[in-house]
Amino acid sequence: TVCGHRRDLSAVDAQAVLALCRGNQVKWELRLSYNLLVRGEGEDLVIVQLSPPPGPVAVTPGQPAAFGEWTVTLGAEPGEGDSYPVSLPEKASLTVTSWKSADRMTLPDSRGPRSLKRLCADAGFRPWQRDALPVLRVDGIPAAVPGVGADAAFAPQPGGPAVFVTFTKEDGNEQ
């Protein structure tokens, strides 16, 4: 049971833990899905529930918004980090949240919408990394995710208004 709900770890997670348990390392640490951290020290195995991702955070153009280890900004110029040009409707509700299983995005030049889970996997994110990613939402719809891209529905039109959404990871480490 994770966070009061029955959850199944993936076979990949289980295989990774078993491989580390059977290995020669005396101390090791592995992050898994559902904000779980597994630590091995000698013959001891400890599973820790990490803090969940933060709840929704409102985003205002020109003001940085903190989301876990990430800072999300909307500005006139691209910033340091992953920046994507987007066209935002006036008076839209702008928030940053974690991903949801129903999220779908259509990336530019793609053949149609795909699940955010699949897009994150294709971008090389492990499940625990995906769980910590900020998702910029426009009126609740996923618009941009660092390392994945911006939804084609929010692509600026030539000569039209645009802002840049920039995602910066605080610790400076790659995902």
PLM regions with names:
Residues 1-175:
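AMP-forming adenylation/ATP pyrophosphatase catalytic core
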